[in-house]
Amino acid sequence: MNVDGPFTASCPVVLASGSPRRQEFLRAMGVPFSVDTAGASEPEPVEGEAAVAYARRAACAKTLPVARRHAAACVIGADTVVALDGVIMGKPAGHAHALSMLRALAGARHEVVSACCICLPGNAQEPVVLHAVTSVWMHRWDDAALKAYIATGEPADKAGAYGIQGIGAFLVSRIDGSWSNVVGLPLTELLTELQRRGVVVPSGAQTAEQDGHAPDVRD
């Protein structure tokens, strides 16, 4: 797909995620990409596993199988984890579970960790893994407001049972760190790394044909 934005890619890019939100971010940045997902279920956290360690492991589990199918591409996968007091909160199993999760988050500070796994062309065995952590404070809403939010259906597929980019924005009173990270992709960190590796370049930069140099996709 060809889209307009501040960046373009010097090699094929494959997003190993079916998340519409992650796709929207790359699309808005102008990075052409295709989508291919691993198809397997996400790994479960190990008892006592830290949120950062789990997010990084899960991101790689989603990315590596796809990278093996696209050796000539840069393959990017991601995972987002919500943790309260160091305990990982997954996606709600139903309305009652969502209410329990939102009650726990209401009036408290929690962390959102998004990790990215990047497999450079021809180098799927040595992925680059990065992550970002954002602190989020949720307003102490009463059960009536929480139940009304759950009734919208939005929490069903969201880590922590809320989506800051949608209706769930009203739940959050403050964040410290990257907003895109809470949505599901640490965009600044990801683009910085991709530009450093030569995978993406600013759209206004000279093309390889103009300056006589081939793109440098560094491992």
UniProtKB/Swiss-Prot annotation:
Chemical reaction(s) catalysed: dTTP + H2O = dTMP + diphosphate + H(+); UTP + H2O = UMP + diphosphate + H(+)
InterPro entries tied to this protein? ITPase-like_fam, Maf-like
Q: Where in the cell is it found?
A: Cytoplasm
Principal localization reads: cytoplasm
Site entry: Important for substrate specificity: 21, 80, 165
Which cofactors, by name?
a divalent metal cation
Q: Where is the active site?
A: 79 (proton acceptor)
Name the top EC class.
Answer: hydrolase
Provide the function of this protein: Nucleoside triphosphate pyrophosphatase that hydrolyzes dTTP and UTP. May have a dual role in cell division arrest and in preventing the incorporation of modified nucleotides into cellular nucleic acids.
The entry's family comment says: Belongs to the Maf family. YhdE subfamily.
**What is this protein called in UniProt?**
dTTP/UTP pyrophosphatase
Naturally occurring in which organism (per UniProt): Oleidesulfovibrio alaskensis (strain ATCC BAA-1058 / DSM 17464 / G20)
